[in-house]
Structure formats: C-alpha cells, structure tokens
Amino acid sequence: KGLIARGMFPVFCVCGGKDMGVRRLMEFLGNVVPFVSEMPKVQNTEGKEVAPDTNGPESLYFFKTSVEPHIGEVSYFKVMSGKVHEGDDLLNADRGSKERIAQIYVVAGGNRVKVEELQAGDIGAAVKLKDVKTGNTLNGKDCDYKFNFIKYPNSKYTRAIKPVNEADVEKMMSILNRMREEDPTWVIEQSKELKQTLVHGQGEFCLLYTSPSPRDMR
C-alpha cells in the first residue's frame, strides 16, 4: 500500500560490476513491487486517465536516451497502453513525425534480448529511431495520447567546466548537449556574469562520473 500510494520509496545499495545486492533487488522487484494493474492510472497532458490496458490503443512513452558505441542511440520506453510489435508505424505526438519501430528489445544490464511484442506496463528499448527524444510519446492509429515530461528534482550541485584547449569549446558544448539528452537531470548554463560554462546535477559524484573526458574531446 505504501508503494502504491507513493508514500514509501525503498532504497537499495547495489554494484552491478561486482554483483553485490543485485539478487536482493531483483527478489524485491519480483515479490513485493505492485503489478502495473494495481497502480493508479496515469494522466495524459489533457488530464485524462490512461489505463495500462493491453487491449487499449497503442501508446509508448520514451523516458531515456543513451548513446552506445557501435550502435548509436538507444531509446528506452514504457508501453503506456496497448501492445507494440516489430515493424509498427507510429506517430510522434510531440514532433508530428512518423516513426517505424524496426526492432524492440528488453534490457538486462548490458544485455539486450530481441522480442517480437511488448504489452502495457512493459519497459523496452528501440535502436536507431529517426526523430525521437526523451519525453516524446509515440502513438498508433486513432490514438492521440501525449504524456507530460518527467519532472525531475532541482539540481543540488554545480560545477564549472572548460576544455583543456580553448579551440575545443564548440566540441565540448556539443558533447554536453548530447549528455543532456541522455540525462535530463543535467542543466547546462552559460554564465555571463562568471564567463564560465556551468553544469548543474543531482550530486558531485554524478557530475564527476559523467563529465566529458579528454578522450571524448578527440
């Protein structure tokens, strides 16, 4: 009940690299976390409640984008309603563009498993989409759902950043904007008063861990 009412937020300490705490987390997800059908219905931008109904209209919400070597952009989504299949032609409700879902995957760590179908409540990934950004909604025929962009907590930590070589400023900004697409909790600011580029994030570790390295600037 606490999880359903969003009054309880369990915290787990895990390390994927050393496989510490992962089993406990997975057991909790499998045994305790409510089914999607038990959760409150989600409201779209018009305030209409959308039930996670597998027989409903097809609608996907994209909540994360990452760029991976040799693959390119990987777009992560949740099936908000209906079912999605390989080869489905969908419409981007935010950008007005058409998109074909060539392949769909379920993801476990660094592993991607190709599947033919995902249903309402499932989380999956698609690769090499043409015009999909974090926060976009893709809909099937005769569906006009559009979901609000996820509201993230305000940034807690700020750090100034500059390239080793001044000639690399444009390249650095390009990398920062790409990282912003991958992690919307990043806020990039060009401070006129300080004449510095500032990055704001959720914590010091987050900024240190994800800041561009000299290798990225090549």
PLM-predicted stretches and their roles:
Residues 10-20, 191-204:
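Conserved short loop/turn motifs at secondary-structure junctions
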Residues 44-158:
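Conserved nucleotide-binding/hydrolysis modules and their immediate coupling elements
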Residues 209-218:
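Single conserved hydrophobic/aromatic residue that forms the stacking wall/gate
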